[in-house]
From Swiss-Prot:
Biological classification of the source: Bacteria, Pseudomonadati, Pseudomonadota, Gammaproteobacteria, Alteromonadales
Superkingdom to which the source organism belongs: Bacteria
Pfam families for the chain: RadC, UPF0758_N
UniProt domain MPN: residue ranges: 102-224
Gene3D superfamilies registered for this protein in UniProt: Cytidine Deaminase, domain 2
GO annotation, biological process: proteolysis
Keywords for the protein's UniProt record, in alphabetical order: Hydrolase, Metal-binding, Metalloprotease, Protease, Zinc
Keyword Metal-binding: yes
Residues annotated for Zn(2+) binding in this entry: 173, 175, 186
Locus of motif JAMM motif: 173-186
GO terms for MF: metal ion binding; metallopeptidase activity
Similarity-based family: Belongs to the UPF0758 family.
Protein name: UPF0758 protein Shew185_0376
Length: 225
């Protein structure tokens, strides 16, 4: 059954229009995007089955195309709709942290980094470049793949900082496993970066590790002095 076939006022789309998107469950929101179910399953049932199959929305949205499209009721069109919605969410977060904005709200930074990195199926190491008044200059993804003390090169971070004339930086990376607890390698990387940036009088304000539903801040733990 498709969304258009629901009795008037009972479908997830009608509920969204009447009560707002915040009142819909994950499955109902996903159903609005999917629009149609398949034989024996309406759109909400299909959405529930997809969320269950992948263990949550995050895993569904970052799953490879071949894994998603192999399931009944989900073809290339529905996959494209889901990816478009995920990318729109990331771009909204990007707009919320525009160039020139002063970082006075830690929650804004956390929300931005969560949206940028939490749904990646691979590790990303990135740098948030700030000026002397802690205004945003740029967010740059520097390294992808397995992030350890041997794969992050301080000289490349220093080169980027000099190029963009940044006065302070926040570095961050994600853990695709979902567990945001920093490793010993993460702590070694941080120490190396802090020392390298100190040689050009640039402050390392924080290193944030992004997990599935949380972010660990080195600064909050007192690991950056």
């Amino acid at each position: 059954m498709g969304i258009k076939d629901w009795p008037e006022g009972e479908g997830p789309r009608d509920k969204l229009l009447q009560k707002g998107a915040g009142q819909l469950s994950d499955a109902e929101l996903l159903a609005v995007l999917l629009r149609n179910g398949l034989a024996g399953l309406n759109a909400v049932d299909l959405a529930r089955s997809l969320i269950s199959e992948f263990g949550g929305l995050r895993n569904l949205l970052c799953a490879p195309r071949n894994q998603v499209c192999r399931l009944p009721g989900v073809g290339p069109v529905k996959y494209a709709q889901l990816q478009a919605a995920a990318e729109l969410a990331r771009r909204v977060a990007q707009e919320n942290l525009q160039r020139g904005q002063v970082l006075t709200n830690p929650d804004l930074t956390r929300d931005y980094l969560m949206r940028q990195l939490a749904d990646r199926s691979y590790e990303v190491f990135a740098v948030l470049l700030l000026d002397s008044q802690h205004r945003v200059i740029q967010f740059v993804e520097l390294f992808r793949g397995t992030i350890d003390s041997a794969s992050v090169y301080p000289r490349e971070v220093v080169s980027l900082v000099l190029e963009k004339k940044a006065a302070a930086v926040i570095v961050c990376h994600n853990h695709p496993s979902g567990n945001a607890e920093p490793s010993q390698a993460d702590r070694r990387i941080t120490e190396r970066l802090k020392n390298a940036l100190a040689t050009i009088d640039v402050s390392l304000l924080d290193h944030m590790v992004v997990g599935d539903r949380e972010i660990v801040s080195f600064a909050e733990r007192g690991w950056i002095n």
